[in-house]
């Protein structure tokens, strides 16, 4: 009897659904932990390492906050939202720092089930919310970016807008004071947590205002909600924002009858003026300027150098095909179609769900803007599927017993989640670095000072700074073409040029931090170098760096290290592209070849490689299509660490080299095909062959996973 009473209590049922959905989400995320724990190479400092490259930026910021300081201009994320939250968790919990950054996403991202279930409950459809929560919490896209070890702001980037959506819907349905104050609170938190959410917040507030003007134009509380929410967009300190919002909320709550529409109109106008004066609309004006005056911007760019566009090399901003798009959002194509149908049906039944459109549309931008955006559509589409299933149950109950209906719903839910479970099982993401790589960088921390620089590719910037506590030229947040040019040049040109550019780029980067805003150092460091060295032709200036008699006039202020990991061989052609581009035209008109491969098959005296090259079994030539190309030399690498290799000359007039790696730390790089230009690059000569000018460099860390060289000039 007591159990029946509990089951009749809607609040207990709602609470039970939230707990079950939350536990389900957390449990699914622990699968990766269980799997990764089998590999010692994924551990560092007695804990699994994280799988998010950008996560090391926030980890560095949190580490510096715990230490209480950081170096000037070190690009540390000191004081950022995720770093701050991590800092406080470290201070108030007994867990290690490594454990906190590993599991934060596991537990915080699973909170998405709460607003989903609460929102559905506002429509008196708890089943809709429960099913939607199960699906949304583990759908492919959301899982990929919030799984255990994915230490990034993504862990709350969907949770917070779903709470905003919930309070908007609740405000529409209940018109209560709690929603009135909670709405600006969560918008403010969202803007603090993820500043890039500004546009989405503007869209949500704008749509809420339009909805108000159409359906609730005579109800004052809705206009106050818009005003309070808009104040969070202002570019002033949070405590001033909070004070203004609380005062206006209190005035409305206590003097509601005296606040007529004229006063509300004045408040609204004052809010708009305040936003303009405080810089709250600057992001919108920037977007308008960028898109409306694009031709002017392009003209400005042509006055300087035209660098390689980094967006061409980032998978997250590549277009995604429609099948993959559907799978990432709903787990499978069929569930996506049902979800879309269900969402349209939900809109017809409950017009307030139109407030979800900005979130849904942002997710659909993935079709043009890249797969990273799909994460936004996940919870909204899941609500559509949950609604469809709840309607399906209502139909079943009319024809069959409650038990039969429940069994059908459970079965349908399991079928829906089956593709997601398969995805979770197969999605075995490796840690960003291996244990050996992390240990090497930790070793570098004991060699280098905090003011020293490590020159390496931007993919490794954040982890290098975290483990070695040094500075870098580039990282996951600073990697425009003009930034990437310098490490690309130092890695892909000859040693002399690499050494000179490493010194110049570091010293000029440091100088740029203290230069006036209109100084050329702020806009283009390469042009600043040329100006100081009285050079007007960029090609002649860059060529002069290869000459031994090139004299560096810039004073040496710190030590510089070159970090060359084995894993960079997989992307080295991309790395080199940034400095082989024609800076006057922006065209990659200096062709080069560097291609890693592994054997797929051996037949008829030929080795078929994964990069499409067919190599003769005597290694004397290779075929690309119908073209047979001679090989200059075969280089057999017996030991990268010891620098043991054997060069077998074949045709000294040929342009291509074949590297056969018998000692490779990268499983999918057994062969490397390269031309003479790449063969003479600093990366190939110094890392693979161990050839370096001892007047320019010292080898301070040596392993087959990575090598670190200290610049001597």
Curated annotation (Swiss-Prot):
Cytoplasmic topological domain: 1-11, 123-125, 175-176, 216-220, 255-260, 348-352, 397-406
Main location class: membrane
Sequence motif: DXD motif 2, positions: 152-154
Ligand binding (Mn(2+)): 54, 152, 316
Classification via InterPro entries: Oligo_trans_STT3, STT3-PglB_core, STT3_N, STT3_PglB_C
UniProt-recorded name of the protein: Undecaprenyl-diphosphooligosaccharide--protein glycotransferase
Superkingdom of origin: Bacteria
Periplasmic side: 36-96, 145-152, 193-197, 234-237, 279-324, 370-373, 428-713
Motif (MI motif): 568-575
Record organism: Campylobacter jejuni subsp. jejuni serotype O:2 (strain ATCC 700819 / NCTC 11168)
């Amino acid at each position: 009897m007591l159990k029946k009473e509990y089951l009749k209590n809607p609040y207990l049922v709602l609470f039970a659904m939230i707990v079950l959905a939350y536990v389900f989400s957390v449990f699914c995320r622990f699968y990766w932990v269980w799997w990764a724990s089998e590999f010692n190479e994924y551990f560092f400092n007695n804990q699994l390492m994280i799988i998010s490259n950008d996560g090391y930026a926030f980890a560095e910021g949190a580490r510096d906050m715990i230490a209480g300081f950081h170096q000037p201009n070190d690009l540390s994320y000191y004081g950022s939202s995720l770093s701050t939250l991590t800092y406080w968790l470290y201070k108030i919990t007994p867990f290690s720092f490594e454990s906190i950054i590993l599991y934060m996403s596991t537990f915080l991202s699973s909170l998405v089930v709460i607003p989903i279930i609460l929102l559905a409950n506002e429509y008196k459809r708890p089943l809709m919310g429960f099913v939607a929560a199960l699906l949304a919490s583990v759908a492919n896209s959301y899982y990929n970016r919030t799984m255990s070890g994915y230490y990034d702001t993504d862990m709350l980037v969907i949770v917070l807008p779903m709470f905003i959506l919930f309070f908007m819907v609740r405000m529409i349905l209940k018109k209560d004071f709690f929603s009135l104050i909670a709405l600006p609170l969560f918008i403010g938190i969202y803007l603090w947590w993820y500043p890039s959410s500004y546009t989405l917040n503007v869209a949500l507030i704008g749509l809420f205002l339009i909805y108000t003007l159409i359906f609730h134009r005579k109800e004052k509380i809705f206009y106050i909600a818009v005003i309070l929410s808009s104040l969070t967009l202002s570019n002033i300190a949070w405590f001033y924002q909070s004070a203004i919002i609380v005062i206006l909320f209190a005035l409305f709550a206590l003097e509601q009858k005296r606040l007529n529409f004229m006063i509300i109109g004045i408040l609204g106008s004052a809010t708009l003026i305040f936003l303009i004066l405080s810089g709250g609309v600057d992001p919108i004006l920037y977007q308008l300027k960028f898109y409306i005056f694009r031709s002017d911007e392009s003209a400005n760019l042509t006055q300087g150098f035209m660098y390689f566009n980094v967006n061409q090399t980032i998978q997250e901003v590549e277009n995604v095909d429609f099948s993959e798009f559907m799978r990432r959002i709903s787990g499978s194509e069929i569930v996506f179609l049902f979800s879309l149908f269900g969402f349209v049906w939900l809109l017809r039944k409950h017009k307030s769900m139109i407030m979800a459109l900005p979130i849904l549309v942002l997710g659909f931008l993935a079709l043009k803007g890249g797969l990273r955006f799909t994460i936004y559509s996940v919870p909204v589409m899941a609500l559509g599927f949950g609604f469809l299933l709840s309607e399906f149950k209502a139909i079943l109950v009319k024809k069959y017993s409650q038990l039969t209906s429940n069994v059908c719903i459970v079965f349908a839910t399991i079928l829906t989640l089956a593709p997601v479970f398969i995805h979770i099982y197969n999605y075995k993401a490796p840690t960003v670095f291996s244990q050996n790589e992390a240990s090497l960088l930790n070793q570098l921390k004991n060699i280098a000072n905090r003011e020293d620089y490590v020159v390496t590719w931007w993919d490794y910037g954040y982890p290098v700074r975290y483990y070695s506590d040094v500075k870098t030229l580039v990282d996951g947040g600073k990697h425009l073409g003009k930034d990437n040019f310098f490490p690309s040049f130092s890695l892909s040109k000859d040693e002399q040029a690499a050494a000179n550019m490493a010194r110049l780029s570091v010293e000029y980067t440091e100088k740029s931090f203290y230069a006036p805003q209109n100084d050329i150092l702020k806009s283009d460091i390469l042009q600043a170098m040329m100006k100081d060295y009285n050079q007007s032709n960029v090609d002649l200036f860059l060529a002069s760096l290869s000459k031994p008699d090139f004299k560096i006039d810039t004073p040496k202020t710190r030590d510089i290290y070159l970090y060359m990991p084995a894993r960079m061989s997989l992307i080295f052609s991309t790395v080199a592209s940034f400095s082989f581009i024609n800076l006057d035209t922006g065209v990659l008109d200096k062709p080069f070849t560097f291609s890693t491969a592994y054997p797929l098959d051996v037949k008829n005296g030929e080795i078929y490689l994964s990069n499409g090259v067919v190599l003769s079994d005597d290694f004397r030539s290779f075929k690309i299509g119908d073209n047979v190309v001679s090989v200059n030399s075969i280089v057999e690498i017996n030991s990268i660490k010891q620098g043991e290799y054997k060069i077998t000359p074949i045709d000294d007039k040929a342009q291509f080299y074949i590297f056969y790696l018998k000692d490779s730390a990268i499983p999918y790089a057994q062969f490397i095909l390269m031309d003479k230009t790449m063969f003479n690059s600093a990366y190939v000569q110094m890392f693979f062959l161990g050839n370096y000018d001892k007047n320019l460099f010292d080898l301070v860390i040596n392993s087959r996973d990575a090598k670190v060289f200290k610049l001597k000039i």
